[in-house]
């Protein structure tokens, strides 16, 4: 039997783009202008480590400059290649357009296994990579603003920001050259949890729409829904934690590199996370059944499947066996174009990656604005809000005394109402609002157009329309 060839990640993104673009009336040539990647820079640089020079290959792709700066993460992984980086850069363009973040799309990567190097060696490598990018304006607050991705985090972003600042000593906005930095290096509260929190807000908004929930063959709210998470990294961990602790969902399956855990009664996400930190994997975790083959749990009966690791985990080889009626793409491109068609034909509802995992770039946008304004969110108005609330509470207390037993304030009302919003609360509020508005834009297309039968196509139509309007406004 001849094996079916899957399209590459880049080809999958283009196929999904083409499906949406075919339903639009774009001016001649503009469709291709939006689809193609503007530029990809490949750098090979040497770093002296352990007595010899090691050569590393890195990429930074700029997909679209309809808005500047361009924005997108930098990942560290051995599998990084030009095809992957260009696909991810394209997704960033559409993602930013969908959530109305004022950026074009970009993405970067370095071919490296971070586990093989000491911290001081990783710093040397990261600083040299940042130097190579910054001297070509591929790291710059007004040109190209990287962020963390797979294999990178706050530590790497702090090194990159410092390297840029050393090279641009008079740039007062130097901190805005990257986002995802630690709080004490110009970061913002809520950035680490942002993508996982965005997954939670996306699911909440989906379940606020009963007709959409019905399309997935479900009813009710998130409470009690059975969840399987593939990948318990930063995104998967936070999404699973918030859904189980705040929304009453039951995480019944967790899939990691060394197998999968399954417990129909629910799994303690925090306990599994601590187990992974201590032991390096999920094997031998005591409170769930371990399976060496993660595919069995991926294909198990559940209500919500959250692929939160690499691209292409749901493909033509396993799509028919996926039983979840609702998939939310926490990772970039976890469902191939072929698998997407199979799942759509089965009636599976997919909340697409370009919307679902946009929490990261949304909060990165907030961090970038914070760095450019040089002031913490809430600093100017928090105490003034508390003073105004105090006036209202004082009047309510007078009313309470006057009415006696006929009416009284709730015991915790005063404490909750008097507390002004801090930066974390403002960030979460802004993210929640962003995810709601973006979902409504997708949903409107999904419901109003007879030729659109899935959320992914709807998301692409919204994003492509916004990018095309931006290009046309510039005179293209």
Which residues does each predicted region cover?
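Structural motif
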Residues: 54, 59, 109, 143-144, ...
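N-terminal ligand-binding/catalytic initiation module
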Residues: 1-194, 200-202, 206-207, 356, ...
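Rossmann-like adenosine-cofactor binding region
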Residues: 259-350
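Adenosine-phosphate binding glycine-rich loop
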Residues: 3-8, 206-207, 325-476
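Glycine-rich phosphate/diphosphate-binding loop of Rossmann-like nucleotide-binding domains
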Residues: 189-299
């Amino acid at each position: 039997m001849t094996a079916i060839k899957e399209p590459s990640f880049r080809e999958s993104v283009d196929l999904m783009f083409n499906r949406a673009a075919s339903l639009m009336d774009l001016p001649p040539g503009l469709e291709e202008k939006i689809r193609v990647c503007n530029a990809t820079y490949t750098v090979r640089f040497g770093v002296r480590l352990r007595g010899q020079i090691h050569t590393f290959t890195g990429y930074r792709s700029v997909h679209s400059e309809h808005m500047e700066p361009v924005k997108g993460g930098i990942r560290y992984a051995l599998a990084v290649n030009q095809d992957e980086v260009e696909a991810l850069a394209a997704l960033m363009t559409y993602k930013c357009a969908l959530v109305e973040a004022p950026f074009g799309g970009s993405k970067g990567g370095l071919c490296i296994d971070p586990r093989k190097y000491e911290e001081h060696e990783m710093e040397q490598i990261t600083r040299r990579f940042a130097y190579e990018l910054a001297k070509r304006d591929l790291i710059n607050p007004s040109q190209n603003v990287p962020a963390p991705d797979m294999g990178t985090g706050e530590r790497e972003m702090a090194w990159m920001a410092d390297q840029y600042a050393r090279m641009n000593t008079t740039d007062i906005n130097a901190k805005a050259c990257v986002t995802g930095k630690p709080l004490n290096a110009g970061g913002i509260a809520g950035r680490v949890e942002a993508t996982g929190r965005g997954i939670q807000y996306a699911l909440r908004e989906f379940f606020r729409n009963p007709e959409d929930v019905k399309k997935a063959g479900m009813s009710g709210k998130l409470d009690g829904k059975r969840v399987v998470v593939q990948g318990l990294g930063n995104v998967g961990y936070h999404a699973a934690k918030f859904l189980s602790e705040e929304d009453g969902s039951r995480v019944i399956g967790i899939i990691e590199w060394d197998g999968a855990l399954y417990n129909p009664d629910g799994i303690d996400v925090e306990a599994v996370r601590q187990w992974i930190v201590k032991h390096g994997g999920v094997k031998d975790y005591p409170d769930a059944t371990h399976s060496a083959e993660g595919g069995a749990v991926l294909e198990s009966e559940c209500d919500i499947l959250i692929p939160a690791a690499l691209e292409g985990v749901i493909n033509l080889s396993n799509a028919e066996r996926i039983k979840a009626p609702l998939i939310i793409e926490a990772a970039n491109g976890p469902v191939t174009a072929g698998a997407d068609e199979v799942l759509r034909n089965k009636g599976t509802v997919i909340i697409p990656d370009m919307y679902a995992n946009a929490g990261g770039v949304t909060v990165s946008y907030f961090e970038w604005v914070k760095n450019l304004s040089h002031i913490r969110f809430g600093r100017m108005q928090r105490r003034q809000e508390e003073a105004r609330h105090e006036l209202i509470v004082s009047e309510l207390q007078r009313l309470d005394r006057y009415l006696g037993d006929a009416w009284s304030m709730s015991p915790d009302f005063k404490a909750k109402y008097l507390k002004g919003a801090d930066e974390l609360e403002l960030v979460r509020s802004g993210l929640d609002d962003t995810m709601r508005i973006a979902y409504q834009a997708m949903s409107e297309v999904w419901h109003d157009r007879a030729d659109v039968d899935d959320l992914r196509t709807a998301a692409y139509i919204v994003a492509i329309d916004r990018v095309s309007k931006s290009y046309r406004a510039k005179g293209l």
